[in-house]
Design a protein with these regions (language model features):
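Sec-dependent N-terminal signal peptides
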Residues: 1-2
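Phosphate-group recognition and catalysis centered on beta-loop-alpha active-site segments
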Residues: 9-308
């Protein structure tokens, strides 16, 4: 497989990016095929982490070109109020180098707090050149943590293999433990995200997910029509997990080992879609397909596309 290498939209302002993306959506919205709601949905986890660096511009482009229907990504907030695409609200030394291309130790990582840095400062860190033993097929390349504006501006120009329009699964990285040092409060975070997806013109193609009940509650209170996904990473019955919310989410998204066919049937019987994370081998992907899940979040959208 030949991997596409892109540096992304470095240098463009976020306001210009938002305007460009919104105009692109409006000019193209009548040219896409309708999505089949019964077809297995392929979500590229952090782009295509098994092939290129996570949450990166090259990763999101590759995910779409390898068959993803949905780009799954993580959101943090910078000091200047920008939505930064990053799994941690700090510079993880396992994937990032500092602006001098020096390694970042575990003790140093949280001193590089994204919530205390501007988007411009964050972009000075290389978060793609470090090799990851867990992903031997990943092509390492210099890249940075982009803003949501930049990702959408680029993704809207990439044709999907089935001719449909790209969709987005956006995770709010909020918790009581992170707040307020590493993230804003749940309501502020939710409003920033909802305002941004509205400005970008993609609200009808967005799902907002979180492990934080407070974050999802805030999203639902501000915009009851926004699609929501409840991320589950702990053991417990399906109902006990759902009871942690005061409303019914559109999607139940458990760690893939925490779900079985009976759970899938129960949830779908309640009109809740089931989209587990993060399965990567053919055997695990096949097992989930056999359960009848609605979609799968995977680091290898290329493998899942061939199995669909």
């Amino acid at each position: 497989m030949t991997l596409l290498v892109l540096t992304g939209c470095s240098g463009s302002s976020t306001s210009d990016s938002a305007t460009t993306a919104s105009e692109s959506v409006q000019s193209q919205e009548d040219t896409f095929v309708e999505v089949d709601p019964n077809r297995l949905e392929i979500q590229g986890h952090r782009g295509a982490r098994g092939l290129v660096p996570e949450n990166s511009m090259p990763g999101f482009v590759l995910a779409l070109r390898e068959g993803a229907d949905v780009l799954e990504m993580d959101m943090c907030i910078s000091s200047d109020g920008q939505i930064i695409i990053s799994h941690e609200p700090w510079m993880n030394g396992q994937i990032c180098l500092d602006p001098n291309n020096a390694p970042i130790s575990e003790n140093q990582a949280k001193t590089w707090n994204l919530h205390n840095m501007t988007a411009e400062e964050i972009a000075e860190f290389d978060c793609g050149s470090v090799a990851l033993p867990d992903f031997p097929d990943q092509q390492n390349l210099p890249t940075y943590k982009p803003t949501l504006d930049q990702v959408v501006e680029l993704a809207e120009t990439v044709p999907l293999l089935d001719g449909a329009q790209v969709r987005y699964n956006l995770e709010i990285k909020h918790s009581a433990e992170l707040e307020p040092e590493f993230c804003p409060d749940a309501t502020t975070f939710a409003k920033l995200v909802l305002d941004k997806v509205s400005a970008l013109g993609i609200a009808d193609r967005v799902c907002i997910q979180s492990f934080s009940a407070a974050a999802l509650e805030a999203v639902h209170q501000i915009d009851p029509n926004m699609t929501t996904s409840w991320l589950v990473g702990t053991e417990g019955t399906v109902q006990s997990q759902l009871d942690k919310l005061t409303f019914t989410p559109d999607i139940y998204s458990p760690q893939w080992k925490l779900i079985d066919a009976k759970d899938v049937a129960q949830l779908q019987g309640q009109d809740i879609r089931v989209i587990p994370w993060t399965a990567n081998t053919k055997e695990d992907l096949f097992a989930l397909i056999e359960m009848g899940v609605n979609g799968i979040i995977t680091d290898r959208p290329d493998l899942l596309y061939k199995m669909r």
